[in-house]
């Protein structure tokens, strides 16, 4: 996850304009956006982290740090203003400290135990400045100086403020104010001669002198290619130059003295593992000192390790199952020289000075070798002093068969004494992978001393506190002065005590003052003169002199309207059209608008279902083609994304108005349950009260299908039956209070007695009720008078327009869907609800098919089979009814 930190120059000199008409700061903002677009082409850019630092005073210089998201980064970038000084040194130190904030907590640097190239946090700092003189509060500086004192704990462990995986690049804007007459030549971008260039080269980066917009785009494309995971190493030659490969004679044409390839400051690429996305390694680069167990602290290290290479040709050594690390070198004069030798079968050993206990140069820990195809040079990192270790391990497994002898152990122990103790951990893992887990004893100490461990742990805790403090301070604005402090010019007596001043007063008033004025400035400590608040608009109607002359007529009109419309609770200081005059830059700021919107009120009665909007096609509920306000999408947009097809969209629909008829609170009637076939039937099973069910509707519901009042809620049986005496009043009260609106209908009619069926299966009662809800009773008035009390007949007419077929069916569908989703195989309630479906036969069949489709979604095979049998029975009985009616 590379970190891309942009350090933007926000000094006042960035307000200068180029020949394009834009300021340097606007050019810098556009360059950042262009870089992000170019970087987004790479799939690896998904893990990029962007940070933004300016030239302001810390901690206000950090605009976007570790916790800020991409939107915050872009918003802070757009709001940058060019004001202040060119404090490049302080800003660079702030940027490096921000990057190093968590390194001591995570242990990336691994102080005192070797440098792990595979444990890194690559970062690139891109500075965009105008290359002007460095200015501070103390004056103008010619050279770049970074502050030595850093508030970050643990900064004393590294000599430089940066680390080996952090590089600095600078875009120095040299755009002229006038158009150049000469045509631009397509050449390389030169280095800039400003003070930041040496700092870039020290970190492994470079500077770009940008003279035209075309050159700026070229630099940005080059910077995108520089985003690589790797660490910077100083390669230095040790010993004599290599002899020519051809005949072993020295090359006379080769110039003497220092060559560019003798000392290179370049990057080695640390490629991430394609499977895990994280680099994998085994061996560290040794420290430049021998660890001392008695030392209470660690000596400071350099940011970039100095790796010396010997030009003596050696054979590359590798044995089976022994891991090694391979890193590709960035193209440099050193890689070019090695590739020109065209000897991929030989290698040059690499060392770190003072890494051994008794040797100044140390022992080799790897080698440089050209690839077989001669297209790159690789650094192979091996175990420390590998020319001694590899033959020992080869003999152990090939000769001794993993059973070491006494002589071999003595040789191995003597090797361990020449190896830094922090190599014991990686070596133990390596020999375990090779098949010798007990070769190195666990009792051997290879860690740091207790005092050093305590010291590092203390630094880690302090770094964590500092990290939390810095992260918490990001985004805070500079505290503005609320007023101008009043300071006394002198600490002497006031002007009132001067003799000439007193005489002057006496000459004017011809009277001696009774008391001298005590105008001592000490009485005004903390006194401030208030500043004018630019955001506060003056109330111009209070003072006529505050009104500009050109706005007098407008104010008179506004004051007249406020006077005539005195019923308002407040006066309007501006016209209605001015309230909606918003700058274009703020029109899309929906988040700030939503913060000011009051929270919506809660539902008056959340248990009542909302009325379904059925205008037009009732089955098409999602209006995807509607034009809605984008501000509302932030609130209600994502809520309907995962709606299932066929499920009613209940969100965003106005709530159904409750019917205020007295019948809702009237006397409850015990429903009469009769058998389909004849005779006294068993009572309908009472259902338990369920808190999630919709509240019961009144027993006497009246629908408005025709001009005549058709009472669908009281369904009469035309077979002469009596009320079953087995149903107790308590049971019926329980059923009435807990059942659904449709479950209150317990008296289906039967027109099928003439068919002569003695047994119609389990769901015969439901089939009869399902068929006959759309049949009209023989005598509407008789049906109503038989079942509804006289006191309720007049009141029942008021309910005629309260409920419709669609509303009843919608509530039934919601309850049936809940029953389908419940676990188990108790489907009696589903068939009980199905018999109360309203509407024509075609509407009921469509309703039943939707129920079957929903049951198939939840793999309810038994329910599907019963519903299909139920559907076949309906078709069969409907055909018989049609046959009887035709006869």
From Swiss-Prot:
CDD domains: vWFA. Keywords: Chromosome, Nucleus, Phosphoprotein. Pfam families: Beta-barrel_INTS6 (PF25462), INT_SG_DDX_CT_C (PF15300), VWA_2 (PF13519). Widely expressed. Expressed in heart, brain, placenta, lung, liver, skeletal muscle, kidney and pancreas. GO terms for biological process: protein localization to chromatin; regulation of transcription elongation by RNA polymerase II; RNA polymerase II transcription initiation surveillance; snRNA 3'-end processing; snRNA processing. Belongs to the Integrator subunit 6 family. InterPro entries: INT_SG_DDX_CT_C, Integrator_subunit6, VWF_A, vWFA_dom_sf. A motif (Inhibitory loop) lies at residues 626-633. The keyword Nucleus applies. The keyword Phosphoprotein applies. Component of the Integrator complex, composed of core subunits INTS1, INTS2, INTS3, INTS4, INTS5, INTS6, INTS7, INTS8, INTS9/RC74, INTS10, INTS11/CPSF3L, INTS12, INTS13, INTS14 and INTS15. The core complex associates with protein phosphatase 2A subunits PPP2CA and PPP2R1A, to form the Integrator-PP2A (INTAC) complex. It is found in: Nucleus; Chromosome. Induction: Frequently down-regulated in nonsmall cell lung carcinomas and prostate cancers. Down-regulation in prostate cancer is due to CpG hypermethylation of its promoter. However, some involvement in cancer is unclear. The gene is INTS6. Residues 3-227 form the VWFA domain. This is Integrator complex subunit 6. Component of the integrator complex, a multiprotein complex that terminates RNA polymerase II (Pol II) transcription in the promoter-proximal region of genes. The modification Phosphoserine is found at residue 804. GO terms for cellular component: actin cytoskeleton; chromatin; INTAC complex; integrator complex; nucleoplasm; nucleus. One of its GO terms (molecular function) is transmembrane signaling receptor activity. The inhibitory loop acts as a regulator of protein phosphatase 2A (PP2A) activity: Asp-629 and Glu-630 residues mimic phosphoserine and phosphothreonine residues and bind to the PP2A catalytic subunit PPP2CA active site to block substrate-binding.
